[in-house]
UniProtKB/Swiss-Prot annotation:
This is Uncharacterized protein MJ1599. InterPro entries: ATPase_PP-loop_MJ1599, Ni-pincer_cofactor_biosynth, PAPS_reduct_dom, Rossmann-like_a/b/a_fold. GO terms for molecular function: catalytic activity. It comes from Methanocaldococcus jannaschii (strain ATCC 43067 / DSM 2661 / JAL-1 / JCM 10045 / NBRC 100440) (Methanococcus jannaschii).
């Protein structure tokens, strides 16, 4: 059975009959409790416009990967809010070289500082790929921990990220010790084609990495192995949410959820960097 709103099926989410139509439980929740994006936008903009009034070398920390979403977040911080962030990139040993080049080029373009922390997540990635599971949540958690430490060290209050989906009904989340995280893109509901259009005037090039990513070498392989094990993509919840919110058509979503074709050059590069796959 297929959800009549998003791309979930009974294989990936519980489907019920609602007013004569099949609908997944996530879509039902949204219908009953729809997010207020205008309210989200007002909350985020109030914080960021007020940050401009504060002194100091940096107004906030931007969790920066060189991918399209964090680059777009930087564009908004600089051009819309006139803020000076410190961009913090965590190179987990498996960032695409194109992503690092993009990060260097874009931060130079905006004349903002870029801090790159070198880490090694080989064990995490090997474990996830071996088991056919997603490494993304664990990787993101480790990266955010590093970014939070820098934020605390510098005495700053806000971490900005390029996440496109909110925390339920808010784009802001409280972290430890008074630090807050803001998912900057969430209130604006940018579609993919809009994002790429907005990046056209920047020194940023889209890499071909397999999967939806514009910065991570591991993702395509992880998606491939998960698909082999379960018969669907671990991106299903995120993609379904994009469809639910009108940010992605069902046709494009279905294509995004297909098993990726990872270029052999990606496998070769991962092995060269020390990943046993």
């Amino acid at each position: 059975m297929k959800c009549s709103i998003c791309v979930h099926t009974s294989k990936t989410k519980k489907i019920i009959n609602y007013e004569g139509k099949p609908i997944c439980v996530d879509c039902l929740t949204m219908l009953k409790y729809p997010p207020n994006f205008e309210k989200m936008k007002k909350e985020v903009e109030e914080i960021l416009y007020n940050l401009k009034k504060e002194g100091g070398k940096y107004h906030c920390i931007l969790a920066f990967s060189g991918g399209k979403d964090s680059v777009l977040a930087l564009k908004l911080l600089k051009e819309k809010f006139k803020l000076n962030p410190l961009c913090v990139m965590v190179d987990n040993k498996y960032m695409a070289k194109e992503a690092i080049e993009n990060a260097l080029n874009v931060t130079k373009h905006y004349q903002v500082d870029l801090m790159i922390l070198n880490r090694d997540y080989t064990d995490l990635f090997e474990d996830a790929i071996k088991r056919g599971e997603s490494p993304c949540r664990r990787c993101s958690r480790l990266i955010l921990r590093e970014v939070w430490r820098v934020t605390k060290l510098l005495g700053l209050k806000y971490i900005i990220t390029g996440h496109e989906l909110p925390f339920g009904h808010s784009a802001i989340r409280e972290m430890k010790e008074g630090i807050k995280m803001i998912r900057l893109l969430a209130p604006y509901k940018f579609k993919e084609e809009e994002k790429y259009k907005m990046l056209e005037d920047l020194p940023w090039k889209k890499p071909d990495l397999g999967g939806y990513t514009t910065n991570c070498l591991v993702l395509g392989v992880a998606l491939e192995r998960f698909y082999d094990k379960y018969g669907f993509s671990f991106e299903i919840d995120r993609i379904a949410t994009l469809v639910r919110l009108g940010l992605l058509s069902k046709e494009k979503a279905k294509k995004e959820l297909e098993k990726p074709k990872v270029p052999k050059e990606i496998y070769e590069e991962l092995r060269r960097r020390g990943l046993k796959i």
